[in-house]
């Protein structure tokens, strides 16, 4: 089986770095939590902005953590690296004897670097194993979901997390195909989806596989779970004048985070069925 070569590692350019620096004001000094360290772009910007800032840098991707350690080596005495999930913030802060910090940042979703690593299986544009785990110490992969869930379960995942109107058609195609042979690569899955949802560049602005890949990635990594609790925990551990910044990419996480902010501000009743969002 031949997989495509991953995209070369380039200097990571953090998203909205100027806006984040203006909002979080690292020049105030003290502790910042970077809950999604990635390759360390935001953390590097914080550390360069102020010699008195320290960063608790969390990420569940061990490969990204290793690269970030190299990048941030000049600042090693001001960074604590943690392999973990930002949603476990309360526990992580206790472990490191921190009670309150002046700023917390999380940048949700998959990074461009992760998408460019064929062996991680996040992208339909690079052929690789159908993995999609952000934390490779976890056991469930996208291939396992694709090859074991029922047609109804697959359709629900693709519809709920990918907002894909053709979810049932795609799920049936997957189930029918896996009877013949397991679906193990990103290329296999992408082609199945494209056959289920005919693709014409004139009709579609995005590849038909986009929503299905997003849905499976969210399911594998349980990305939308406990985001509301994270917001509560984060605010509880901010100093009185502290700030929480959350960068969202797609509408599902955006709605959840905005609602959690409204609840914390007393603008909305927290007792709401998440499926109605």
Model-flagged regions — what are they?
Residues 1-277:
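S-adenosyl-L-methionine-dependent methyltransferase catalytic core, i.e., the SAM/SAH-binding region
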């Amino acid at each position: 089986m031949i997989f495509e070569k991953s995209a070369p590692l380039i200097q990571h350019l953090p998203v909205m770095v100027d806006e984040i620096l203006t909002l979080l004001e690292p020049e105030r000094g003290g502790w910042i939590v970077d809950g999604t360290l990635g390759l360390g772009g935001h953390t590097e910007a914080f550390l360069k902005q102020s010699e008195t800032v320290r960063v608790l840098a969390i990420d569940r991707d061990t490969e990204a953590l290793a690269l970030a350690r190299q990048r941030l080596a000049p600042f090693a005495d001001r960074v604590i690296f943690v392999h973990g999930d930002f949603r476990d913030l309360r526990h992580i802060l206790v472990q490191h004897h921190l009670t309150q910090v002046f700023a917390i940042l999380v940048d949700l979703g998959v990074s461009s670097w992760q998408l460019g690593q064929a062996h991680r299986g996040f992208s339909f544009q690079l052929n690789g194993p159908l993995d999609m785990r952000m934390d490779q110490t976890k056991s469930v992969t996208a291939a396992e979901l694709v090859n074991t869930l029922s047609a109804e379960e697959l359709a629900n995942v693709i519809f709920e997390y990918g907002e894909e109107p053709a979810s049932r058609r795609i799920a049936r195609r997957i189930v029918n195909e896996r009877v013949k042979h397991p679906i193990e690569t990103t290329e296999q899955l992408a082609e199945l989806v494209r056959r289920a949802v005919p693709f014409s560049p004139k009709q579609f602005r995005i590849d038909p596989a986009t929503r299905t890949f997003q849905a499976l990635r969210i399911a594998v990594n349980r990305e939308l779970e406990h985001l509301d609790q994270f917001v509560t925990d984060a605010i509880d551990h901010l100093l009185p004048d502290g700030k929480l910044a959350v960068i969202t990419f797609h509408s599902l996480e955006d709605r959840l985070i905005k609602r959690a902010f409204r609840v914390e501000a007393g603008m909305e009743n927290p007792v709401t069925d998440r499926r109605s969002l």
